[in-house]
A protein has these predicted regions:
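Cationic, low-complexity basic patches in intrinsically disordered or flexible, solvent-exposed regions
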Residues: 7-9
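Active-site-proximal or metal-binding-adjacent scaffold patches in catalytic folds
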Residues: 12
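Catalytic cores of DNA base-excision repair glycosylases
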Residues: 35-37, 42-233, 237-246, 250, ...
């Protein structure tokens, strides 16, 4: 849902809010309750007028839908998630359908969304629900938090948004709103900073209307209190926000300490026979776990050795344009090496190999760089 015009948003009632103290215990519990009620009242008033209420997972809401959306939304924006969510719901209308599906198909539908461990955990969690809970999504915090890929905030979001249970949340959007409003210094990835933010989230979460409030906090962070260029003049918390008062929003939340990412090189072998290209499935865990990728080598010598062992002629081996793919912990410089072959019988003994048909793609999960190179091959970019 788009944010409405600035002139409209400024009509939201604003209250003066004295910041809660993150470092010292409040001297008066009544003061904290009053401040928290002011905070939640402002946020709820804003949400009733401007919050998002028609996202696909908000229609005919169920714990399964909310869980699926929350996992997809980790590290990913709403606009990107929507088409993936809709495809998943068509193919897997129930958690039992997801549990019984092959992992390859789940990874295939996830291709392009990134952070593939989420998809593997999603599949494991669905199987766990089918086995331990008879296909009914659990409804207690401990049971939900025990699912693979679900932490405290995600569990709280699932139960509060779908069932109205009283649990605070602390996703990236909520961290940003709280850190700015109460000037919580430091990177939220540090335990002591996260602890302060959790304490604030617990204090401001109202006893009633938690479903609307938690959604409102996520919307406020996504639509108004954005990472860059926040719309402070449109924020219902503007008069009580320390960062707004001090024009210091850029300082909050604190940034992750910079680190120099190591660089690696990977040679990808794009071996093509007519409309088919050789792919190999990665091991279940580790980098691109369970996805199909081109045979990969640390250097060109390793690639030539692999071809020689299989008596494959490398005379027509051609290097394509190299490019960089960045992971959270290193850069991978990918060097694609294209090789047309007249026969693929020498590679059929590869147990995890697949000849991928470019014209009729099989339903398997692909790493993003692999999908990019396959698309180039489809349009004849190797020539």
């Amino acid at each position: 849902m788009q944010v409405k015009e600035e002139s409209q948003l400024r009509k939201v009632p604003v209250y003066t809010l004295r910041p809660l103290c993150c470092n010292l215990a409040p001297s008066n519990n009544e003061t904290v309750i009053m401040q928290a009620s002011q905070f939640s009242a402002q946020v709820l008033s804003w949400y009733d007028k401007y919050g998002r209420k028609t996202l696909p997972w908000q229609i005919d809401k169920t714990p399964y839908k909310v869980w699926l959306s929350e996992v997809m939304l980790q590290q990913t924006q709403v606009a990107t998630v929507i088409p993936y969510f809709e495809r998943f719901m068509v193919r897997f209308p129930t958690i039992t359908d997801l549990a019984h599906a092959p992992l390859d198909e789940v990874l295939h539908l996830w291709t392009g969304l990134g952070y593939y461990a989420r998809a593997r955990n999603l599949h494991k969690a669905a199987q766990q629900v089918a086995t331990l809970h008879g296909g009914t999504f659990p409804q207690t915090f401990d049971e939900v938090a025990a699912l693979p890929g679900v932490g405290r905030s995600t569990a709280g979001a699932i139960l509060s948004l779908s069932l109205g249970q009283h649990f605070p949340i602390l996703d990236g959007n909520v961290k940003r709103v709280l850190a700015r409003c109460y000037a919580v210094s430091g990177w939220p990835g540090k335990k002591e900073v996260e602890k302060k933010l959790w304490a604030l989230s617990e204090q401001v979460t109202p006893a009633h209307g938690v479903e609307r409030f938690n959604q409102a906090m996520m919307d406020l962070g996504a639509l108004v209190c954005t990472r860059s260029k926040p719309k402070c003049a449109l924020c219902p918390l503007q008069n009580g926000c320390v960062a707004t008062a001090n024009a210091s929003w850029a300082q909050y939340p604190g940034k992750k300490p910079k680190q120099t990412l190591p660089e690696r090189t990977g040679y990808f072998l794009l071996m093509q026979h007519n409309d088919e290209v050789l792919l190999a499935q990665r091991p279940p865990s580790g980098l691109w776990g369970g996805l199909y990728c081109f045979p990969q080598f640390e250097d060109e010598d390793g690639l030539h050795q692999w071809l020689a062992q299989r008596q494959i002629n490398a005379d027509n081996l051609t290097q394509l344009t190299a490019f960089r793919h960045t992971f959270s912990h290193f850069h991978l410089d990918i060097v694609p090496m294209w090789l047309p072959v007249s026969s693929f019988t020498t590679c059929m003994d590869e147990g995890n190999a697949l000849w991928y048909n470019l014209a009729q793609p099989p339903s398997v999960g692909l790493a993003a760089p692999v999908e990019r190179l396959l698309q180039q091959l489809r349009v004849g970019a190797q020539v």
